[in-house]
Amino acid sequence: MNKVEIAGLGSYVPPKILDNNDLSLIVDTNDEWIRCRTGIRQRRISQGENTSEMATKAAINAMKSANIKAEDIDLIVVATITPDNFIPSTACIVQKNIKAVNATCFDISAACSGLIYGLDIGTQFIRSGRFKVVLAIGAETLSKILNWQDRSTCILFGDGAAAAILQMGEEESILSMYTGSDGFQGDALTCPAVPVNNPCTTSDFQKSVVTMDGKAIFKFAVKILVKSVKMLLKEQEVTLEEIKYIIPHQANYRIIECAAKILKVDIDKFYINLDLYGNTSAASVGIALDEVYKKNLVEKGDKVLIIGFGGGLTYGGLLINVI
């Protein structure tokens, strides 16, 4: 079985910062209320950039990090719930933008677990020998599917993109993988598509925004975060003490805090940047992982856990060996 290396990482967030004070001007909320309940201080909002554009910029940064050319890429997988179009896929648009002439391209929809799923898919293709170089991307323009009068959701999300280059190599980056789904709780986090009965009715389109049962999602997220950490460690017979960082989906500080208490681990073991970006869904763990590498917070031989969970409901994680 072929070994899989994480050859490069890249991310991109739009320059426009929308902080909590800005939000207080458009919805009934304030900075203290948001920070106390979520840990979020600000988020990035796209101004004219669509998902494919941000995905392209993250991809270019990952390619530079990996020192590869676009024509080397065999597969592009884009995880997103906010594509530019139904057709063509965001992955095909990225292919055109970066001129990856040899790549097979497709999108996947797994919400906040999306990049985990994409990395899992890419890893399996490389291990099987089908492809040698895979570009996995998580990218979202969540600002376009939010109800900006609903303070229970609009305060949580931001826009951004993250990318990783996986390639066949001499060392193993992906020590273990874990994914799962719970469609039985899917109604806890939804965003309707075009209505079947009358797709031309403007009022129906206005209903295509995110709605969330916050309590149900919170309970699910804490449970799954703890479960995923334990399962990934058990598979490789690794202890929490051997983990340099746990990089969780950046949804809510309280979720991470509760999970840390259950796992009996210091909160500092978790890498957290949600205060700056909010919940960027599929891009979340990738932006954080890229930061950890760029800041030189890890070195060769360190082990890192990344855990995703979100709409679907979906979840998953990876145990990464830094090479």
Curated annotation (Swiss-Prot):
Function: Catalyzes the condensation reaction of fatty acid synthesis by the addition to an acyl acceptor of two carbons from malonyl-ACP. Catalyzes the first condensation reaction which initiates fatty acid synthesis and may therefore play a role in governing the total rate of fatty acid production. Possesses both acetoacetyl-ACP synthase and acetyl transacylase activities. Its substrate specificity determines the biosynthesis of branched-chain and/or straight-chain of fatty acids.
Subunit structure, as described in the record: Homodimer.
Domain comment (free text): The last Arg residue of the ACP-binding site is essential for the weak association between ACP/AcpP and FabH.
ACP-binding as annotated region, ranges: 250-254
Species of the source: Clostridium kluyveri (strain ATCC 8527 / DSM 555 / NBRC 12016 / NCIMB 10680 / K1)
Similarity field: Belongs to the thiolase-like superfamily. FabH family.
Database matches in InterPro entries: ACP_syn_III_C, ACP_syn_III_N, FabH, Thiolase-like
Top EC class for this record: transferase
Gene Ontology CC, one term: cytoplasm
Keyword presence, Acyltransferase: yes
Name used for this protein in its record: Beta-ketoacyl-[acyl-carrier-protein] synthase III
